[in-house]
Amino acid sequence: MDATTINSLFLVGALLVAASILVSSLSSRLGIPILVIILAVGMVAGVDGGGIIFDNYATAYLVGNLALAVILLDGGLRTRVASFRVALWPALSLATVGVLITTVLTGMVAAWLFNLSVIQGLLIGAIVGSTDAAAVFSLLGGKGLNERVTASLEIESGSNDPMAVFLTVTLIGMLASGQTGLHWGLLGHLIQEFGIGSFIGLGGGWILLQLVNRINLAAGLYPILVIAGGLAIFALTNAIHGSGFLAVYLCGLVLGNRPIRSRHGILHMLDGMAWLAQIGMFLVLGLLVTPHDLLPIAIPALGLALWMILVARPLSVMVGLLPFKAFHGREKAFIAWVGLRGAVPIILAVFPLMAGLPNAQLYFNLAFFIVLVSLLLQGTSLPWVAKLLKVTVPPDPAPISRAALEVHVTSEWELFVYRLGAEKWCIGAALRELKMPEGTRIAALFRGQQLLHPSGSTTLEVGDLLCVIGHEHDLPALGKLFSQAPQRGLDLRFFGDFVLEGDARLGEVAALYGLKLDGIDPGMPLSQFIVQKNRGEPVVGDQIEWNGTIWTVAVMDGNKIQKVGVKFPEGTRPGPGLFL
């Protein structure tokens, strides 16, 4: 390869990445997932469009694995361990039992539609059996879903790859050797994948955390150290026959949930790296496919995709979540719909090609077609389905910017900046009248281009910039304090006519609103009553019905219900109102 060829590769690669970024602005206007647009750019530039011929499956496999490792590391860093209280076991059930059921149901229909053997059909089912972390993390961000749904989908997508990889590799081995039966040794191999991946991921994450916090480096080197360490953990786990995908996700989880030096710098750089990984991966996969090869299989492939989306995935979710009573029917329905397929199935479809199996090109084309249908149908409709099934909750108002305060090595202090508009509740209030969360301080107040010296008598005006020092866990309280009037109205429409304290006694609540206790202990706190009726760990947005009224969890403090909204049937709202 001469210098001219290398320079041409740089030019084409840079133009494709730039084009993907520029056309991504169409995503919000057209309501099409950004990953589909990037995939389309690759297809348009490929053999049937711009004429770029790319058929190197080994390179695609390399790029795909590298990109997924970075995306999973970033996803783990942003996942809060607190969400595990409501979603760990349900997500693991979906990642194992769910993938197995989807594989079998999809595989049997694939064998019938394409006149394949049962083992060949099951291989297709295994290839498309897992949800994709890149697609899930990308499309769920900022949708305002309740914690139980979001955590279940994110943990599932981060942990279901071992099952899909295990099934795919096992079935490829069976086809290559002519084997037709299963044996118990395969179960041991699956346990090995999960066990080694978990051990190396958690242990390696802890070691990497100690390195970051104990070694003095230039600030810009810490993100690079984290990425290099994450990739080393990914590769080492794969080398000893564990799940590298699970390991790198757990590594990120450890780093993201412990005090770590240069936290914001690491997250900021990884955000950009994760975007670059997604763009590069979907561009390569778009270049790899030959669009005219998809046309002959379009009708049966569409039938298989719809079967998986409308039948196999919903059945696997219903069975996988059967033991978990906290999930409402609408939450199960949404989780069933958001079985997003992305890069993982396409990368798994490269395995048969590299193994030289018969019909390997068919497996690849089918996987690509199913991913395309999934992203277009499920990804595009996700916001509408979320509203239809009522799994969204009003988001907490966020600061316009936030920055870390590195006062010591593992400092978790941050500076939050809020801009006060005319609709803010605090306009006209003196600073001493603000009920600031404990441990927070107002550091500065800007009015126009002037820095004021704030005192207790300083009143807030429209357009003021307020700088507050606090911790991440103070954001919900600060958000409520500096919320907008329309946002508060949205809260009241969602949570109900009144909001009560979670420790209010049922007897007092019943007496105030004329409700019947029917043998319920009048001394029981309202929060405890809702937990009992909910039959599981509560999250914001959970609802129960009692005495013809709707009771909604409005504010959580860790595992404890802090505030509860109550909504009365039309025309029966009591008075006077109560707002606590």
From Swiss-Prot:
**What is the species of this protein?**
Pseudomonas savastanoi pv. phaseolicola (strain 1448A / Race 6) (Pseudomonas syringae pv. phaseolicola (strain 1448A / Race 6))
The alphabetical list of record keywords is:
Antiport, Cell inner membrane, Cell membrane, Ion transport, Membrane, Potassium, Potassium transport, Transmembrane, Transmembrane helix, Transport
This one is known as K(+)/H(+) antiporter NhaP2
Per the record, the similarity remark reads: Belongs to the monovalent cation:proton antiporter 1 (CPA1) transporter (TC 2.A.36) family. NhaP2 subfamily.
Summary of the function given for this chain in its UniProt record: K(+)/H(+) antiporter that extrudes potassium in exchange for external protons and maintains the internal concentration of potassium under toxic levels.
GO cellular component, as recorded: plasma membrane
Q: Mark the transmembrane ranges.
A: 6-26, 34-54, 57-77, 86-106, 108-128, 162-182, 189-209, 217-237, 240-260, 279-299, 302-322, 334-354, 366-386
In terms of InterPro entries, this protein maps to: Cation/H_exchanger_TM, FAD-bd_PCMH-like_sf, FAD-bd_PCMH_sub2, Na+/solute_symporter_sf, NhaP2, RCK_C, RCK_C_sf, Transptr-assoc_dom
Query: Membrane topology for this entry?
Result: Multi-pass membrane protein
**Gene Ontology molecular function terms on file:** flavin adenine dinucleotide binding; potassium:proton antiporter activity
Keyword Transmembrane listed? The answer is yes
Q: Where does it mainly reside?
A: membrane
Ranges for domain RCK C-terminal come to 402-484
State the PROSITE patterns in the record: RCK_C
Reaction(s) catalysed (UniProt annotation): K(+)(in) + H(+)(out) = K(+)(out) + H(+)(in)
Q: Which GO terms describe its biological process?
A: cell volume homeostasis
The record's listing under Gene3D superfamilies reads: 1.20.1530.20, 3.30.465.10, Regulator of K+ conductance, C-terminal domain
UniProt xrefs under HAMAP family = NhaP2 (MF_01075)
One Pfam match = CorC_HlyC
List where in the cell it is found.
Cell inner membrane
